[in-house]
Amino acid sequence: MWSLTVILLISYFLGSIPGALWSSKALHGVDIRNHGSHNCGATNAFRVVGWQAGALATVVDFGKGFLAAGVVASVIRIDPIPSGLSLFGGDPFVVLGLLAGVGAVIGHMYPIFARFEGGKGVNTAAGMLFALTPLTMAITLAVFVAVLLSSRYVSLSSITAAVAFPTIVALRRFGFGADLDPSLLVFGGLLALSIVVAHRSNIQRLLNGTESQISSFEPAQGMLGRGEL
């Protein structure tokens, strides 16, 4: 049980690395929590300081989830595996990867290194799930890109992709006989729900027609580059 605790703690601290905040401060000396949406995530980094910090934040946030689920959960061995990790009839090693990934997502949303003011966890969750089921996540990312290109709303793209993931898992498992662990479907559904809840203010702005859109897919200058800070 101590090994499981260590995995969760390491994953939380890994997730707590505030990629958007630190990249924005390092490259531009700007605390993005004071500007834009005030969210400490990659999208706000793009919006406030431009593509360089935003791209770096995206890679860091994705990597946190990938490393937690794909590396931390594998390097620190648990022997024997607690029977409770076979929840939902799933492979306990897959469930362990999911728990480690969730630890990183929680760290991203409530980072100890940034006064517990984090992002919404979409990129970190994507990294976690890519480590565990890369083909499903590749399809999900294609859905994200398609919605983004057609709507120009990052929030709508994130919400759609979150709902698409468990749907794709179900279709692949039950429709095409893919050997996908059932825990992916359960966790995917719970994660989709949490991401939708985290975006409730965005949903309200989408309904009101006041949500910010991407004006151009050229490398973003951000508010800083446009002299708006």
From Swiss-Prot:
Which compartments does it reside in?
Cell inner membrane
Cellular component GO terms held in the UniProt record: plasma membrane
**TM ranges:** 2-22, 56-76, 93-113, 129-149, 151-171, 178-198
Q: In which pathway does it act?
A: Lipid metabolism; phospholipid metabolism
InterPro entries named in the record = G3P_acylTferase_PlsY
Molecular function terms in GO for this entry? acyl-phosphate glycerol-3-phosphate acyltransferase activity
What is the membrane topology listed in the Swiss-Prot or TrEMBL record?
Multi-pass membrane protein
Write the Enzyme Commission number(s) for this entry.
2.3.1.275
Q: Which keywords belong to this entry? A: Cell inner membrane, Cell membrane, Lipid biosynthesis, Lipid metabolism, Membrane, Phospholipid biosynthesis, Phospholipid metabolism, Transferase, Transmembrane, Transmembrane helix
Which of the seven top EC classes does this enzyme belong to? Answer: transferase
Tell me the domain of life.
Bacteria
Q: List the catalytic activities from the record.
A: an acyl phosphate + sn-glycerol 3-phosphate = a 1-acyl-sn-glycero-3-phosphate + phosphate
User: Can the keyword Nucleotide-binding be found in this entry's annotation?
Assistant: no
Per its UniProt record, what HAMAP family does this chain match? Answer: PlsY (MF_01043)
Query: Family assignment?
Result: Belongs to the PlsY family.
NCBIfam families assigned to the protein according to its UniProt record, in alphabetical order: glycerol-3-phosphate 1-O-acyltransferase PlsY (TIGR00023)
* Subunit structure comment from the entry: Probably interacts with PlsX.
**Stated name of the protein:** Glycerol-3-phosphate acyltransferase
Q: Which gene encodes it?
A: plsY
